[in-house]
């Protein structure tokens, strides 16, 4: 699927919602304003700010314009300079700050108030707390008994597409991207004439939990939106795992189709929603997912 096809899908979905389609997006790293090469370091600089991310620490560069262009082209840690064999103080502090931010988003919980404000049914896996979630991934792949009963009682049975949201390893990925991905996703699926199940939130869920959900509800396609394991300085990245007719006993990882890096600096959430709608339609047409799909 090329960029032109993606933009056409986005326009179609947004038109059905009565909204103007966004202009073609570019990754944030392409528009970052870079600071000029500097020789001094400020302890007052906010290490999470755009200014800190654009900081160039190479002293007395031969071609400052080349460093500026390189810094604009990537979010990688380039042009940070050295102090002998060691990184400069600001580069090291920013590394530690980004590492701390990534750890924080793994350990944070999605507030119950936020889930209620979105009008989502909340269920959970067999996990009872974050520590157990991190040490027992196998328990995050199964729903607790109360969750099974809640889904049977409150969710639409036998949908064409069932959308599930889970915190995964990044709370920020869910709370930051939710408003921009779920409404256009649901609207696009309904516009396509598909029977859409009741969206709900699974606390402490792992990817494979979608197999049990699909089996319980009789869903043809299950779409799981889950927080990705955060990288350094990027804690808002969301993934979509889609699978056709999942079964706990027989579905393997190769049966899943994954769309990753969904965030404003990667694949924009609205654009991802349009791609997921198209993916769900093709899964239903081909009655397959993962490596079994024909491209």
Curated annotation (Swiss-Prot):
Give a yes or no for keyword Glycoprotein in this entry: no
What is one GO biological process annotated to this record? Answer: ethanolamine catabolic process
Report any Pfam family annotated for this entry. EutC
Give the main location.
other
Which molecular function GO terms apply here?
Answer: cobalamin binding; ethanolamine ammonia-lyase activity
Tell me which stretches of the chain form a coiled coil.
none
Compartments annotated for it: namely: Bacterial microcompartment
Q: In which pathway does it act?
A: Amine and polyamine degradation; ethanolamine degradation
Gene3D superfamilies reported in the protein's UniProt record: 6.10.140.690, 6.10.250.2060, Ethanolamine ammonia-lyase light chain (EutC)
> Which GO cellular component terms are attached?
ethanolamine ammonia-lyase complex; ethanolamine degradation polyhedral organelle
Where on the tree of life does the source sit, at the highest rank?
A: Bacteria
* UniProt function note: Catalyzes the deamination of various vicinal amino-alcohols to oxo compounds. Allows this organism to utilize ethanolamine as the sole source of nitrogen and carbon in the presence of external vitamin B12.
Name listed for the protein in its UniProt record: Ethanolamine ammonia-lyase small subunit
